[in-house]
Amino acid sequence: MNQQATASQKTRAEQETENEANRLREQIDTALAAVAVRSPDEIESLQSAADRIERAARDLSDALRQLAQQRKVPEI
């Protein structure tokens, strides 16, 4: 099954959860790249990365909770 067909079968909550998970992965990758750079200028970058990861993790948690709630409600 192609990706477009699979995407059309996902609910909005599933798509949002997947998007938030991907965003968190991207933030983690960016943070890991910042860890590899050792310079005084990178201190602020590391702190910013931590803030972005916290926000992305919260957004993913919210999306997962919404998805769980949606799946509790039986479809008619």
Stretches found by the model and what they are:
Residues 2-38:
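N-terminal acidic leader/helix
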Residues 33-76:
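Short, charge-rich amphipathic interface segments used for partner binding and complex assembly
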